[in-house]
């Protein structure tokens, strides 16, 4: 199945937070939810688990100054192409999901699209498809999207 069960391990690269209280809280959440995590720069450790049973969680809407040049909302920026690279290299589908909070403050999770890497020529086409989906999601409820303030910094 493409979708995790409560018993599946989740593998996720993370950025360590400098606030020790928040990082401690996040560690408890990761442990409780059966997450195996790696510092985001340590993809070699992440890849060592590629044949493990579990779910690989990769965030795609992250600006990387030295990342792939892409267009997002019609403007040039950069992006980590790692999810597309990993998907294409290992022939692993990408499941695009997002959450919405309703008027009662209840969070609903939606599965938007499953991207099968064999249907794309290269990782750049996969990233373009991912970001096209993100644009649709964001335009639906822009007030609920977490924006990075430097998304279009430096005019790339």
Briefly describe each language-model feature range:
Residues 6-9, 44-156:
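Non-catalytic C-terminal accessory region of glycerolipid acyltransferases
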Residues 1-41, 65-70, 75-76:
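Catalytic core of membrane glycerolipid acyltransferases/transacylases, capturing the structured
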């Amino acid at each position: 199945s493409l979708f995790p069960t409560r018993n599946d391990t989740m593998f996720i690269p993370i950025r360590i937070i400098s606030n020790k209280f928040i990082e401690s809280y996040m560690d408890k959440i990761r442990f409780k939810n059966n997450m195996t995590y790696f510092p985001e720069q340590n993809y070699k450790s992440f890849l060592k688990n590629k044949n493990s049973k579990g779910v690989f969680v990769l965030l795609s809407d992250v600006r990387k100054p030295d990342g792939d040049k892409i267009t997002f909302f019609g403007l040039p920026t950069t992006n980590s192409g790692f999810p597309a690279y990993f998907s294409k290299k290992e022939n692993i589908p990408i499941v695009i999901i997002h959450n919405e909070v309703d008027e009662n403050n209840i969070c609903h999770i939606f599965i938007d699209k499953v991207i099968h890497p064999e249907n794309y020529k290269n990782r750049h086409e996969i990233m373009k498809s991912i970001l096209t989906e993100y644009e649709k999601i964001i335009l639906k409820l822009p007030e609920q999207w977490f924006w990075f303030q430097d998304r279009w910094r430096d005019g790339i």
